[in-house]
Amino acid sequence: MGIKGLNAIISEHVPSAIRKSDIKSFFGRKVAIDASMSLYQFLIAVRQQDGGQLTNEAGETTSHLMGMFYRTLRMIDNGIKPCYVFDGKPPDLKSHELTKRSSRRVETEKKLAEATTELEKMKQERRLVKVSKEHNEEAQKLLGLMGIPYIIAPTEAEAQCAELAKKGKVYAAASEDMDTLCYRTPFLLRHLTFSETKKEPIHEIDTELVLRGLDLTIEQFVDLCIMLGCDYCESIRGVGPVTALKLIKTHGSIEKIVEFIESGESNNTKWKIPEDWPYKQARMLFLDPEVIDGNEINLKWSPPKEKELIEYLCDDKKFSEERVKSGISRLKKGLKSGIQGRLDGFFQVVPKTKEQLAAAAKRAQENKKLNKNKNKVTKGRR
């Protein structure tokens, strides 16, 4: 699910922490990718012309494999060396979120049964997409044959991606989930595995710039994210993103905020603290997650197993042999070239001061107001 409203807060208060770039900008980088999130994207986005999922003659879904094969090739073509991280067992605290998802699934199935148009049916079917154990296993088999390393995390894939980045095994963690920032990955890449046809730039978020720009410690940032709404517990009812940030900056921790609300000083009867709120346990899952020590992991990219890859994709899954062979050639070329040095590796980046970050935030807000006024003028002329 990620963190509700966090991207908007960063965009408004620390716009310089988000850099939008073309995929070519990451040439020479190693990246740890949240595999479960990517597979979910592929199952939704990689479709036939009629909107249905891709399948082979036996009726087996192949959208996830098509997405994994060709999106990985795109990264390799652009000089990126990806490794994928799969979710392990979810933390016990996540059970409440999984229960909510199950309830929503039942409701969606009901809406699908009642749908009368093909468009509505397609919409509800996409909401029912779920990454299964079989999808994960098939993707892992494909990556092994392609020569791309993968890891099965003890629990959350995002936490393991962040660990690899923190230990210097990769440059960044790649996921659509903003909660990856809570694990203090140096950089978070969003939209990396999107289709090229979307023309969506990759968003690179600098975690340390976010912390400095918001003037929060990592502990306070995690508390903010819990207040905004995360997968591990409920948030304070009635408190939106703007108020959550204000409360954290004023009081410094959830404990102090709870004291403030319970004392009656807030004069706000709409704010409701959840009963038996496990925010402390949620905080520790972010600050001290269960991961494999990055120093113990050796990432290795190997030449693709050409014969086995053709058998798996072409014979078993009925992919086009011509296209698969072309993909194998691209893989061989990309993986053989290795990681070349980047010019920015020879220069030390000078951290931005609080004043510079504040000035950038002010400029962004002024531009936002200017664009709003322009839109009003345009509408008035119509």
UniProtKB/Swiss-Prot annotation:
A Gene Ontology biological process term: base-excision repair
Example of a GO MF term: DNA binding
Cofactor note: Binds 2 magnesium ions per subunit. They probably participate in the reaction catalyzed by the enzyme. May bind an additional third magnesium ion after substrate binding.
GO cellular component, one term: mitochondrion
Chain sites annotated for binding Mg(2+) 2: D177, D179, D231
Lineage: Eukaryota, Fungi, Dikarya, Ascomycota, Saccharomycotina
InterPro entries: 5-3_exonuclease_C_sf (IPR036279), Flap_endonuc (IPR023426), HhH2 (IPR008918), PIN-like_dom_sf (IPR029060), XPG-I_dom (IPR006086), XPG/Rad2 (IPR006084), XPG_CS (IPR019974), XPG_DNA_repair_N (IPR006085)
The entry's keywords: DNA damage, DNA repair, DNA replication, Endonuclease, Exonuclease, Hydrolase, Magnesium, Metal-binding, Mitochondrion, Nuclease, Nucleus, Phosphoprotein
Name by which UniProt lists this protein: Flap endonuclease 1
Organism: Saccharomyces cerevisiae (strain RM11-1a) (Baker's yeast)
Transmembrane intervals: none
Region described as I-domain: spans on this chain: 120-251
Positions that bind Mg(2+) 1: D34, D87, E156, E158
Compartment(s): Nucleus, Nucleolus; Nucleus, Nucleoplasm; Mitochondrion
Positions of the UniProt region annotated as N-domain: 1-105
Cofactor(s) the record lists: Mg(2+)
